Regions:
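Secreted glycan hydrolases and related glycan-binding modules that recognize and/or cleave
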Residues: 1-183
Length: 183
């Protein structure tokens, strides 16, 4: 099982002591389908390239953006890409995910579950659920996939207090001390 720890450039050096692969949360989509990078250490190598679409413009050229991501993967020896898309699925983002997955293959391209329709990409299934059966949830997510190993888990460490009934599935965040007091 491969585990990636998502880190910003400021967290990368400290996180490297955990001896696991890192997903470098340092990239975003810029104007004219460019790939923009935050300040990374020169020696940053391996792990995943993580791209956000927060505040990103329309992707006019999925090919151009894919080529930029491919070059960066080669330069930094990244083993794949995590598309940390926050926007709802849109044709330009789906086209980028599919183009990148095709060009980067056999290296993985991970996408949010809402982008699971992107051919060749691996959907991330969020493990932070507030009810139901987790095994059933995974079985349902896997049912639509065409190959084994076609899912990845997005594990988030959360501490929340839920007032029942929890209609929204969102609870009130708890500090470590508040959780201990409840236990």
């Amino acid at each position: 099982m491969q585990i990636y720890l998502a880190v910003t450039p400021a967290e990368a050096q400290e996180a490297s002591r955990f001896r696991c692969s890192l997903a470098h949360v340092a990239y975003c989509i810029g104007p004219d389908s460019t790939l923009l990078r935050q300040n990374l250490l020169l020696q940053t190598r391996g792990g995943l390239l993580s791209v956000t679409d927060r505040g990103a413009p329309f992707i006019a050229s999925p090919e151009r953006l894919s080529a930029a991501a491919l070059r960066e993967c080669g330069r930094r020896s990244y083993g794949g890409v995590l598309l940390d898309f926050e926007q709802p699925p849109a044709p330009d983002r789906l086209a980028f995910a599919e183009t990148l997955a095709r060009r980067l293959s056999p290296r993985p391209v991970y996408v949010p579950e809402s982008y699971a329709a992107a051919s060749g990409a691996i959907p991330l299934i969020c493990t932070a659920i507030s009810g139901g059966n987790f095994v059933q949830r995974l079985q349902e997510a896997a049912a639509g996939r065409d190959r084994a190993g076609g899912l990845a888990l997005d594990v988030q460490r959360l501490r929340m207090d839920f007032t029942l009934p929890a209609q929204s599935g969102e609870g009130r965040p708890l500090s470590g001390r508040e959780l201990q007091d409840l236990l």
